[in-house]
Design a protein with these regions (language model features):
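N-terminal first-folded block
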Residues: 4-35
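Helix-rich interaction surfaces within compact, conserved domain-sized segments
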Residues: 13, 64-103
Length: 103
């Protein structure tokens, strides 16, 4: 098992850096994960991240289309917020597992 140390706390991650335990996620950790992806988080980013976390907790299989239909952002905005693989990157920053729909 791999670990990430953040604020003197060990965080369990998988080989791709996704949190194994979403309850270890904090907004501060999200900022750090976003920095690693060269993203500066805004309130709009957190709206998306919180929506992703809520849907994951409900057991919803996430997809780019579902995010685009969320009412928070459309697909173009989603790509703008998380360039280079929006669902994959946003899920990692949100502290949830990589969605099955991501390669």
């Amino acid at each position: 098992m791999e670990t990430l140390v953040f604020n003197e706390t060990k965080i369990d991650v998988n080989e791709e850096g996704y949190l194994k335990n979403p309850s270890q996620w904090t907004p501060e950790l999200a900022h750090e994960l976003a920095r690693e992806a060269n993203i500066t988080l805004t309130d709009k980013h957190f709206e998306v991240l919180n929506w992703l976390r809520a849907k994951h907790a409900e057991g919803v299989a996430l997809s780019i289309r579902k995010v685009g239909n969320s009412g928070i952002v459309d697909i173009k905005q989603f790509y703008g917020l998380f360039p280079g693989g929006p669902l994959k990157i946003s899920s990692k920053i949100a502290g949830i597992p990589k969605p099955v729909s991501c390669i």
